[in-house]
Amino acid sequence: MEITFQDFEKLSLRIGKITSAEKIPGMKKILKVQVDVGERLATAIAGGAEFYEAASFIGKRVVVLTNMEPKTIAGVKSEVMLLAADFEGKPVWLTVDQDVPVGTKVR
């Protein structure tokens, strides 16, 4: 399915910094993370808890979709989406290798 450039422009992709990450009771594959996206702290659900320790997320600068409709997952309201590549069934978070300020727009 193709999208138009105008559709792409509707996406608010930003650099976010993960400030906290914790296991969700009863859940083995997802974590609750707090992400600083510049104008606010937002909650997200991140997959991969069976591959990564929660502490390994903290401090990472990741690419985040900030204007997605919130969705409640496992009783947690997820307000943004962290972007990841799916490599051999394992999420690999899209990160930046420089100290890019949180809230910076991704184009």
Predicted segment positions?
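Phosphate-backbone binding interfaces of nucleic-acid-interacting proteins
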Residues: 1-107
